[in-house]
């Protein structure tokens, strides 16, 4: 019985060491850049192939530069999209890419103005 406990303990210690080694190597091999650009993207719907392709192309560039892309789908709900913009502000993104569900929504306009006032660049796509 004691032999089984010793083996289990050794296996546990071995797994813990491998985990720590993996974490260490990750941080040594993957360059950390505290100046990574954070981008928030919200399109009126991700059910449209156009927005999927657009987002995939943006994501490729973001990954190449080791930056961060947060993509959200409001599913044609302007209130949800407004909440997403407010979340991007809280996350302190550098850029918001938006295809507005309702470009005339006062709540959405207010949230986007707040983003702009905090220094976030706002890029509107596929809208008049």
Regions found by a protein language model. Give the residues of each.
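Hydrophobic membrane-insertion alpha-helices, especially the h-region
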Residues: 9-24
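Ser/Thr/Pro/Gly-rich low-complexity linker/stalk segments immediately outside membranes or between
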Residues: 27-41
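Extracytoplasmic "Venus flytrap"
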Residues: 40-56, 70-82, 87, 101-103
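Extracytoplasmic/secreted envelope proteins and their assembly/folding machinery
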Residues: 55, 59, 82-85, 108-112, ...
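Flexible loop/hinge segments that line or gate small-molecule binding clefts
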Residues: 103-128
């Amino acid at each position: 019985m004691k032999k089984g406990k010793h083996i289990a303990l050794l296996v546990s210690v071995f797994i813990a060491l491998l985990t720590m080694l993996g974490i260490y190597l990750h941080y040594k091999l993957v360059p950390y850049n505290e100046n990574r650009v954070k981008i928030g993207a919200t399109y009126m719907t991700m059910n449209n192939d156009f927005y999927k392709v657009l987002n995939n192309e943006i994501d490729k560039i973001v990954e190449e530069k080791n930056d961060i892309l947060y993509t959200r789908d409001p599913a044609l709900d302007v209130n949800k999209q407004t909440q997403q913009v407010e979340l991007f502000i809280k996350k302190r993104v550098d850029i918001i890419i938006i295809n507005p569900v309702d470009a005339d929504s006062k709540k959405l306009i207010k949230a986007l103005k707040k983003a702009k006032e905090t220094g976030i660049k706002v890029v509107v796509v596929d809208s008049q």
